[in-house]
Amino acid sequence: MRIDLHVHTAYSADSKIGIRQLLKWSSNQTKLDGIAITDHDSIEGYRKLKKSGINNDDFLVIPSIEISYPQGHILILDITEEPSKLLMTTEEIIDFAKEQGGLIIIAHPYRFNGLRDIAENFPGDAIEILNPTASNEENRSAKLLAQSRNLPGIAGSDAHRIEDIGRVSNNIQASNEVEDITKAIKEGKVEINSGSFE
């Protein structure tokens, strides 16, 4: 499965990607098999997609969220509800993810809105080691962090514009079931497609 694990929709204040546009572009104009919708502090984009009836059975959409933690951003994959409040503590984020059965990814840890030094000890299942919106040095530091913590590294486009979807992606050795995908990520069965990024 080739998946972009970090994509925003118009339900993130800093993105204008509409739901119809997102699905049409992602499933027809990229080589992706799926995406994770990771809107800021909301799963409304995923909800609207499901309610709309717009569907492509051959294209997987993973319900996810990008939590705006006071010290940085955290991705949680495979969730069906939003947290009851914003600005959660570390313990609340972990509890929320566990209750949902979600996978915690430390997003762009060394970018301006990443966890930075806190990332060294923040509980997570994987680390985003390639993000085109981060500098090469920030991505290198994230990769070293994943290696030192013995955590899988993943890529995410962090797309806020339609043409950025799939700029980087992940080949995940799994079926098209979300549970299999999150399990494979935890087990490190991920190969990054870096496009023009290293």
Language-model regions: role of each:
Residues 97-106:
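Short beta-strand/loop segments at the ligand-binding rim of alpha/beta enzyme cores
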Residues 1-28, 32, 44-48, 52, ...:
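Charged catalytic cores and adjacent phosphate/nucleic-acid-binding surfaces used
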Residues 81-97:
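Structured beta-strand-rich core segments of catalytic domains in phosphoester-bond hydrolases
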Residues 35-36:
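A short beta-strand/loop micro-motif in the catalytic core of glycosyltransferases
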